[in-house]
């Protein structure tokens, strides 16, 4: 069973599908958020308020929903697997308010979708995936 590891919805169970989906492990999620939270504290940065988290290969939404649980304002999910999308929507509706998430049914790598982000001074991209050049 997959659970949220921290924040407001700590221990909340997430629906999953099958062995095809490999959610980010709880250890990796805890490590990721611990690192960025430590960085934010050290540099006096407001980490979550009025911020958007991009879950680029969302699967069932573990990373994005973890971000919402910890106080992120909004999550944008990208997922293109039809079976997984239904589980992702179910998980989002069990945790998020309707205005806290958007789901794009797209393959991000081949997408022609353009998203406009205003007033972004810096950003980071984090992925457990290895890409071939």
Task: Locate predicted features.
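S-adenosyl-L-methionine
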Residues: 1-65, 69-70, 80, 85-121
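A generic structural signal for alpha->beta connector loops
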Residues: 50, 72, 98-100
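Conserved acidic residues
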Residues: 51, 73, 121-124
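Anionic group-transfer/hydrolysis microenvironments
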Residues: 57, 81, 130
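Conserved SAM-binding motif I beta-strand of class I
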Residues: 74-79
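A short SAM/SAH-binding and catalytic strip from SAM-dependent methyltransferases
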Residues: 123-133
């Amino acid at each position: 069973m997959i659970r949220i590891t921290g924040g407001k919805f700590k221990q909340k169970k997430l629906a999953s599908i099958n062995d095809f989906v490999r959610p980010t492990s709880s250890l990796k999620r805890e490590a990721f958020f611990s690192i960025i939270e430590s960085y934010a504290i050290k540099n006096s940065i407001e980490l979550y308020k009025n911020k958007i988290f991009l879950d680029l290969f969302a699967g069932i939404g573990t990373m994005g929903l973890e971000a919402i649980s910890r106080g992120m304002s909004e999550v944008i999910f990208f997922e293109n697997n039809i079976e997984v999308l239904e589980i992702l929507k179910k998980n989002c509706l069990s945790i998020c308010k309707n205005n806290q998430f958007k789901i794009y049914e797209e393959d991000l790598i081949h997408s022609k979708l353009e998203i406009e982000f205003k007033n972004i001074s810096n950003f980071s991209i984090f992925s457990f995936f290895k890409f071939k050049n």
